[in-house]
Amino acid sequence: VADVHFNPNVADVAALYCEKVRINPGNYVDPARKFIKQEYTDEEYAHELKKIEERFVPFLNICKENHTAIRIGVNHGSLSDRIRNRYGDTPEGIVESCLEFLRICKKENFHDVVISIKSSNTVVMVRSMRLLVEEMEKEGMNYPLHLGVTEAGEGEDGRIKSAVGIGALLADGIGDTVRVSLSEEPAAEIPVARHLVDYIGKKQGHLLIPAAAYPGFDWL
């Protein structure tokens, strides 16, 4: 997965060679946050959305031609000034930041999409994901969701924080893939993720869909 920030041109190139490209709605077209307070009229706001669409659609076309999937990965800490000025630093703003791009994907009939919404604040992360599921259902969208808590830390604290955020959503039946992020060796993250998934899988009504490696996948 190519993780691209700040430069949509890099995302275009990455889509030619990578199986999946992650973009961050907060800095894909909107400039980096400067914490500037600016009120947008509805007309001005619509113009900004049009700029996103004009830049995002060519990227989707490259992905279509090369069978490249994308992940729309929203970070609580990198919401654009435009979103923050209209919605504040809220779950509603986080969700709208994601939906702006999802609506374009739906309009362009592009569905090789995975979504992630991450925050170091587990309350914000859980509320945002629950709200996103509600809004997607209203708009007839159904995309896989990737769960994770950023900056969870290490040791017992990091494991508890990950369990609170990811576990709460899995218990709701929300989430298709998970990533536990610890400030430790990457191998230490895997047992924690497996334990969470196994625990939820044992609960009544939470049947897991087992993952299988693609036959032609080269693990090297």
Task: Please place each PLM-identified region on the residue numbering.
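Catalytic alpha/beta core domains of metabolic enzymes, predominantly
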Residues: 42-52, 84-220
